[in-house]
Amino acid sequence: MASSKARVQRKAQANAPSHVKRKMLSAHLSVELREEYGVRSARVCKGDTVAIIRGEEDVRGTEAKVLDVFTKTGRVSVEGVTINQADGTAIAHPVHASNLIITKFNTEDQWRMDSLSRKKEAKE
């Protein structure tokens, strides 16, 4: 992004193509995962276990599984993080991916795990 103006940055993020927005869904790894895989961050995927490090006091520190990932908005739905509607029903409250730390990967995606191990081998 070429501009330094905040509103131009926001517009570029909002109008970015999906392959660029996908990269904006990355979160830092926990210290243990960082040492194991040799990378600092990775994309958040459904089934990962994450810890919320920023946000409201009642959700901060929560560690739970990712239920859904919204590429368009750059937010993640985390198990147990809900808000109440006016009629009393609880709905999922999406959290921005930058406010999360990945503590455990969903190991069902073999391509993703191979990709992480290749990155580790490349650093060695």
List each language-model region with its residue ranges:
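Short, charged beta-turn/beta-strand-edge "cap" motif at the junction between a beta-strand
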Residues: I53-R60, T82-N84
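Residue-level "contact hotspot" at macromolecular interaction interfaces
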Residues: R40-R43, E57, P94
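Structured, basic alpha/beta domains of bacterial-type, RNA-associated proteins
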Residues: E63-K119
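Intrinsically disordered, Lys/Arg-rich N-terminal extensions and targeting peptides
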Residues: M1-K46, K119-E124
